[in-house]
Amino acid sequence: MRHFCASAYIIDPETKKILLVKHKKLTRWVQPGGHIEPNEFPEEAAIREAYEETGIKIKLLGERFPREDDFIRPLGIQKNRTESGVHIDFIYPAIPLNHKELKISKESTNIGWFSREQLETINVFPDIKITMDYILKNYFNEVD
């Protein structure tokens, strides 16, 4: 079965920290995201999932495809195979629009902001570190 998903790498422009949720099933820290609903565009799903999983509203950062419908290009598309099928994830860099109290969704056990250095001390997939480095360098002019 094919699963189309969208996720947001939410980075605070002031602190350069990333917002991650600790996924209940995976028992790892991951970026907020989830399945794209029928009749929903990937960028809409990324915004919706971020709000559902964290309680904050976001603005996607990305190149806008020059068309009437104002399509935002994803930073990348991640693909992997699992027991439930093929997962295709549209990845978007984002910034928070509000910093109200974070909420933990039923799919997570924890939520938090992490610096790049802190990612070395928590259980994350290597892709999260690589993607955060890319976003910091290309969207926030952070040089390692």
Report the location of each language-model feature.
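Short connector loops at helix/strand junctions that flank enzyme active sites
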Residues: M1-C5, K24, Q31, E83-D89
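Conserved N-terminal beta-strand and adjoining loop/helix that marks the start
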Residues: M1-K17
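Conserved Nudix-box catalytic region and its N-terminal flanking loop in Nudix hydrolases
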Residues: K16-K59, F65
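Active-site segment of metal-dependent pyrophosphate-handling enzymes
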Residues: G55-K100
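NUDIX/MutT-family hydrolases
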Residues: I91-P93, L102-M132
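Compositionally biased, intrinsically disordered linkers/stalks adjacent to structured regions
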Residues: D133-D144
